[in-house]
């Protein structure tokens, strides 16, 4: 069970308690800090859409510390990021693996960051296949389709050729922060909020 801290703020009407994620949302900060599942994706998407409705021009910050997760859930977040009219600054803290790495790369170019000791990893999609021979063939074809689709997205986000993405993704392909710059996953390694283009990361 995950413990969610609460913070207390002084307001004109007295003290008000809120969970830490709601407090961060006030500063247009969204946190992806676990496996990317459908429930998590729905929460993140709702937060992103809420922030867009509040101010369609102001940057949104997405902090990622995730081992990856479900492809459809990750793609739903990815499509929402691309749907937004504002810039999305992405930050890797800890790790951004699999779908986490794809979401990291989906940020606005020039505003994709990683902290110095963070790690990134890309690989091909995987999944257990059960059922009749016809079912197995259909599921295998779907995995191959998703493999090409994800490679095309990463190619667009990183500037790497699709063929290289597919080759590198055959096995777990790990990168440190500096390597991720060369690969095109991120634009800059930062050790302080002052190093980013977003001067109000935390208000």
Swiss-Prot record:
The UniProt record lists the keyword Repeat: no
The record's annotation in PROSITE patterns points to: CLP_PROTEASE_HIS, CLP_PROTEASE_SER
**Principal location:** cytoplasm
* Family annotation (SUPFAM superfamilies): ClpP/crotonase
Q: What is the main EC category here? A: hydrolase
Under Enzyme Commission nomenclature, its number is 3.4.21.92
Q: Which Pfam families match?
A: CLP_protease
> Could you give a GO molecular-function term held by this entry?
ATPase binding
The record places the active site at 98, 123
Q: Name one GO biological process term.
A: protein quality control for misfolded or incompletely synthesized proteins
Keywords linked to the UniProt accession: Cytoplasm, Hydrolase, Protease, Serine protease
Which reaction does this enzyme catalyse, per its entry?
Hydrolysis of proteins to small peptides in the presence of ATP and magnesium. alpha-casein is the usual test substrate. In the absence of ATP, only oligopeptides shorter than five residues are hydrolyzed (such as succinyl-Leu-Tyr-|-NHMec, and Leu-Tyr-Leu-|-Tyr-Trp, in which cleavage of the -Tyr-|-Leu- and -Tyr-|-Trp bonds also occurs)
Cellular component terms per the entry's GO annotation: cytoplasm; endopeptidase Clp complex
The cysteines joined by S-S bonds are none
List where in the cell it is found. Answer: Cytoplasm
* InterPro entries with a match to the protein in the record: ClpP (IPR001907), ClpP/crotonase-like_dom_sf (IPR029045), ClpP/TepA (IPR023562), ClpP_His_AS (IPR033135), ClpP_Ser_AS (IPR018215)
Q: Which CDD domains match?
A: S14_ClpP_2
Work out whether the entry's keyword set contains Hydrolase.
yes
The record's family statement is: Belongs to the peptidase S14 family.
**HAMAP family given in the database record:** ClpP (MF_00444)
Its assembly, as annotated, is: Fourteen ClpP subunits assemble into 2 heptameric rings which stack back to back to give a disk-like structure with a central cavity, resembling the structure of eukaryotic proteasomes.
Functional note = Cleaves peptides in various proteins in a process that requires ATP hydrolysis. Has a chymotrypsin-like activity. Plays a major role in the degradation of misfolded proteins.
- The name on file for this protein is ATP-dependent Clp protease proteolytic subunit 1
Q: Which gene encodes it?
A: clpP1
